Amino acid sequence: MPAITVKPLTPPAGSAIDFGAVITDVDLEHLTDGDFSTIRSALYTHLVVVLKNQHQLTPKAQYELTRRFDPSATQYGHGKTLDAKRSILHPDLKTIPHQPQVQVIGHGFIDSYEGLENITLKHPHHRTFHRDPIPQEDDYDSTRFYRWHIDAALYGLNPPIVTTLLAVKVPGGRRQTVRYDDGSGETMDVPLGTTAFASGERMFELLSEEDKEFALSSRVEYAPHPYIWMSPARSLPTGLGLHSDDLELPLSELPPIDESAIQILPMVWKNPATGKPALQIHPSAVRKIHCGDGTVIDDLKKVREIAYKLQRPAISPQYVYAHDWEEGDLVLFHNRGVLHSVVGAFGEGEVRLFRQCNLAAGEGVVPYRE
C-alpha cells in the first residue's frame, strides 16, 4: 500500500478550529511501524484524527492500536469504577467479553454484537444530568453539550493518552441545534449524535496573560472517587461544570478513600511531541485549586467559577469541532490535549452502536511548567 497521507480538516464556514485531520487509507490490522509513526505524529499535531473506512476493525486490533501509543498501558482508563452502581459512568458502557478493555456505547436495542446478546444501549440525555433541561417540546430539534470532560479516572489511575472511538452503526442524517442557554445567545448547528471537541491548546491561547500565568502556576485537586462524589450534582447548561447547590456526596458516604490516590494535577499540560501547552481541566470533577503562592482555594463554588472563566471562551461555537459520524469512522483523540462532549438526543428507532477504548497511562501527565 502507498504511504498514508494526513490531511488537515477543512474548517466549516464560520469556524475557527485549528485542529483535526483525516487519514483515508490505512490497514490497522497490519499496521507497519512507519504508518503507526505517521498516525502518532498526526495525533499529537492535530489532536483529533479521523481514520475513514474502518468497518472491519476488530476489537482486538482497536485495543492493540490504542495500546501502541503507550505499551505500558493495559487496563481500561477508569479501571473497575464501572462496577460502582452510584458512578455517573455506570449506565453508559458495556464491556466486550473477549476484549474487556473495549467498551460498547450507543443507543437502542442490539440483538447480538461481539459476544453481547440482547443489549439495550442508552445515549445519555442531557435532562438526566443538567439542572435546567430544554423543554420537552423543543427536545427533538434542540440539544446541549452533555458534559465536557477528559476521559480519566482522576483518582488512582493516570489519564489515558488517547481514546479510540469507532462508529459501527450510525442513525441517518438529521441535525440538531446545541443551545448554550447561558445568556450568551450562542447556538451551534450540529449533526445528530455528534461528538464535540474543544482544543486545550486553543483554550490556553485564548487566556489573558494574567490568566495564563495563573494557570501555569496552579494545580487542580480532583475529588476522590469523583464520578460517585458528583453523582447527585447537576450540570450547567453549557455542560461545562456543575451548579454549586451542595448536592455532592459527603466524603463519608464515598467508598474507602486512599489519600495517595487523590490526584493533584497541573492545569496546563505539555504536548509530548510539539511541546505546546494545553489547558486541561475536568470541570465537573474539580474540588480544590492549589495556587502558585502556596494557598489553596477550597470554596467549591469559587473553584468552579475560576475553572469556568478559564475554559468557557474555548467552547464557543467557532472553536468547537462537531464530528459528523459516518459508519466506519475511527476517531482518535489526544485525551491530554482536548476536551470532548457527548451531544444530542435520539428518537424512537434511531439505533447507534460505537466501540470505545482508552487505557490508563503508564506515566502521569507532564506539566508545561516544571
From Swiss-Prot:
Changing residue 122 to A: Affects the binding of 2-oxoglutarate. GO terms for molecular function: alpha-ketoglutarate-dependent xanthine dioxygenase activity; dioxygenase activity; metal ion binding. It is found in: Cytoplasm, Cytosol. Fe cation binds at residues 149, 151, 340. It catalyses: xanthine + 2-oxoglutarate + O2 = urate + succinate + CO2. SUPFAM superfamilies: Clavaminate synthase-like (SSF51197). One of its GO terms (cellular component) is cytosol. One of its GO terms (biological process) is xanthine catabolic process. It comes from the Eukaryota. Changing residue 340 to A: Exhibits only 0.17% of the wild-type enzyme activity. InterPro entries: TauD-like_sf, TauD/TfdA-like, TfdA_dioxygenase. Cu(2+) and Zn(2+) completely inhibit the xanthine dioxygenase activity, whereas Co(2+), Mn(2+), and Ni(2+) partially inhibit the activity. The inactive metal ions are presumed to compete for the Fe(2+)-binding site. N-oxalylglycine (NOG), a known inhibitor of several Fe(2+)/alpha-ketoglutarate-dependent dioxygenase family members, competes with alpha-ketoglutarate and provides a Ki of 0.12 uM for inhibition. 6,8-dihydroxypurine acts as a slow-binding competitive inhibitor. Alpha-ketoglutarate-dependent xanthine dioxygenase is a non-heme mononuclear Fe(2+) enzyme that decarboxylates alpha-ketoglutarate to succinate and CO(2) while hydroxylating xanthine to generate uric acid. Allows xanthine utilization as a nitrogen source. Whereas xanA is highly specific for xanthine, alpha-ketoadipic acid can replace alpha-ketoglutarate as a cosubstrate. Exhibits ferroxidase activity in the absence of substrates. This is Alpha-ketoglutarate-dependent xanthine dioxygenase xanA. It comes from Emericella nidulans (Aspergillus nidulans).
